[in-house]
Design a protein with these regions (language model features):
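N-terminal structural segment of carbohydrate-active enzymes
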Residues: 1-151, 159-169
Length: 170
């Protein structure tokens, strides 16, 4: 079994990377990490390395050469953290890990901490085209894994979600 923490695995599609100041998480702006060799920050749940499902597809030969029989994915659903355990939407794969086909809106202005102004993030993670394309990307990963005789386990954490989600009436 090979566990994949997708954000830290392989960046196969830089166009879907979380951008610095795209939104705030736990009161501070998120940050895109350029140097994969850099030591992680203390509050590194706000740091994104850009690994994605395209990167997993790109490394399927490598995984097969290792003799991987099962790929165990950390959560992949829409979530503001890099670990994805605080899920916003269980229906869709996070477009930052999948595919972004619509990329409208603005980054947060310097000093702004309110995500209602994070229009680029809102578009990226709520636009139906992005969400559907991301689910399709995951289906491609699963199909390719199965074609190679590998099985896929998804860490679904269905017993809890993040506080920023579509079910809370605020």
């Amino acid at each position: 079994m090979y566990q994949i923490y997708t954000d830290r695995f392989c960046n196969g599609d830089p166009s879907n990377d979380v951008l610095t100041n795209e939104y705030c998480y736990i009161g501070e702006p998120v940050h895109r990490v350029e140097d994969w060799g850099r030591y992680p920050a203390q509050m590194d749940v706000r740091e994104f390395y850009g690994g994605d499902l395209q990167g997993v597809l790109d490394k399927m030969d490598y995984l097969q050469e290792l003799g991987v029989e099962v790929i165990y994915f950390n959560p992949l659903f829409v979530s503001p953290s890099n670990h994805k355990y605080d899920i916003q939407d269980y229906d869709y794969i996070d477009p930052h890990l999948g595919k972004i086909v619509s990329d409208e809106g603005e980054l947060l202005p310097d000093g702004q901490r309110e995500n209602r102004f994070a229009s680029r993030y809102i578009d990226r993670v709520t636009n139906k085209a992005n969400l559907e394309a991301s689910n399709e990307m995951f289906a491609q990963v699963v199909a390719e894994a199965h074609r190679r005789g590998m099985r896929v386990i998804l860490d679904g954490v269905f017993n809890h979600c993040g506080s920023f989600n579509k079910w809370m009436d605020r």
